[in-house]
Amino acid sequence: MIEYMYRDTDAIEVIKISKDDEYGDVQRAVEKTDGRLLVIGHQFYPGKQAELSQDKNCWEFFYEQIQVPYDVRYNYFKVERDPKEEERVFNKLNPNNEPYIFIHEDAARGFLLERDHFLDRGLKVIENDVTENIFHFTKILEDAQEIHCMESSFKTLIDFYCEQDNIFYHDIRESQPLGQNSSPKWSVITYD
């Protein structure tokens, strides 16, 4: 997925880290950098929980960690789209071309969105298909009648590509608010 995202530039080298030897792979990659390494991540969260509860999202912390202005996120984002693959995924998940709701949740980790928040419960529901490249969902996202999602890569993609009304952020992960610098088009649904 990461290689796909950066396939149009030679300036970025993507290094695969195996699950079998994660520590060793990372150590070898670090040794090849000659000290030119930019570290961004969750390990810098300690003490930030109060800020997370005040509507700051994880991506905002990442930008702050490396002192990059938030607007860089929107002004320089680009992914070379693949219309054929987007159409293939669209046809796979919506073969009858019905109006639909797109939903992104993470049932495997217990993050289930409450369907009673759907505006039109009669619409077909299309869920994330983990066998497909997230970037091939762009047409599905753009054409959805409603979108419901939690904090995820899909939420980020929706931030960039979706202009329609009826886009809902389900705040089901207490440590992941929408964020102060996300697109204003989101309606937030909070969970107790």
Where are these regions (language model features)?
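Catalytic machinery of carbohydrate-active enzymes
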Residues: 1-192
